[in-house]
């Protein structure tokens, strides 16, 4: 195989870049290690800054987002059981869009299909070769275990911190700037109405909490937990009880709880 550009990683960054290149008539191939079903169902972040919204709209993937997404003109911060609102619109003339990464990725895949961009899923043993030469190579095994080699002028890594691309940066060129916190966010997704029409970021002596949403009937909540904690330690009832303690009273008094449909811990 031969492509002008090979993108490793079929998430939103890789697929948006693939779309931009395809619209510029650049031949591009996307390699993704997970199944298409997994990529289109995984739960990730749900709030988009407006420059991202503009970029999606500019590249033809904003129609469903405009119809189903929620525009927020501010957010709430709380501490010591008091909350106040930061008005984005009046302060900096900006907004944010609540529209889940799952939905963004779905829209991007649909648009890539129109442009006939090839995405190969379930690739394994990906290796990048001859990076410093005029033509580079990517080798991989497909889902049937068959070896493949792709020639390319440009190879772009969009496969994240744990992806194979990062490991190919020469050690003398790699600079790492990071702060690792001793805690993570325990997140719960539930088919319940959001507790607030805008997000609530809560500071509490027991730890941080966030009240977010995906739509008017799908809520996303987080609480800060130690990195050593396990999902098995948290029943739904325990999570809701702890969340109520950390949210301001005016929110916790109206919180509607229900069974979780997804639960995970994200390290920070």
Name the predicted role of every residue range.
Residues 41-45, 49-115, 132:
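Active-site-adjacent segment of FAD-dependent monooxygenases/related oxidoreductases
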Residues 126, 133-149, 153-268:
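Conserved FAD-binding catalytic core of PHBH/FMO-like flavoproteins
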């Amino acid at each position: 195989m031969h492509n002008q550009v090979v993108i490793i990683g079929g998430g939103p960054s890789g697929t948006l870049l693939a779309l931009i290149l395809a619209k510029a008539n650049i031949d591009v191939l996307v390699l993704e290690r997970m199944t298409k079903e997994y990529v289109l169902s995984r739960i990730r972040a749900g709030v988009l800054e407006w420059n991202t919204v503009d970029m999606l709209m500019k590249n033809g993937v904003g129609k469903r987002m405009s119809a189903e997404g929620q525009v927020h003109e501010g957010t709430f911060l709380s501490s010591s059981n008091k909350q106040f609102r930061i008005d984005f619109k009046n302060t900096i003339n900006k907004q944010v869009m609540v529209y889940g990464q799952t939905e963004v990725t779905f829209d991007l895949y649909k648009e890539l299909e129109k442009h006939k961009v090839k995405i190969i899923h379930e690739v394994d043993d990906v290796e990048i070769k001859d990076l410093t030469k005029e033509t580079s190579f990517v080798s991989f095994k497909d889902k049937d275990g068959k070896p493949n080699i792709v020639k390319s002028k440009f190879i772009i890594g969009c496969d994240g911190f744990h992806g194979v691309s990062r490991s190919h940066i020469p050690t003398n060129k790699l600079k790492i700037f990071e702060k690792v916190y001793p805690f993570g966010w325990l997140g719960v997704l539930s088919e319940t109405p959001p507790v607030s029409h805008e997000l609530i970021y809560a500071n509490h002596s027991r730890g941080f909490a966030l009240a977010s949403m995906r739509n008017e009937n799908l809520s996303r909540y987080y609480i800060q937990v130690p990195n050593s904690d396990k999902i098995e330690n948290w029943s739904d009832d325990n999570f809701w009880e702890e969340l109520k303690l950390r949210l301001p009273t005016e929110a916790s008094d109206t919180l509607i709880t229900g069974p979780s449909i997804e639960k995970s811990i994200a390290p920070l």
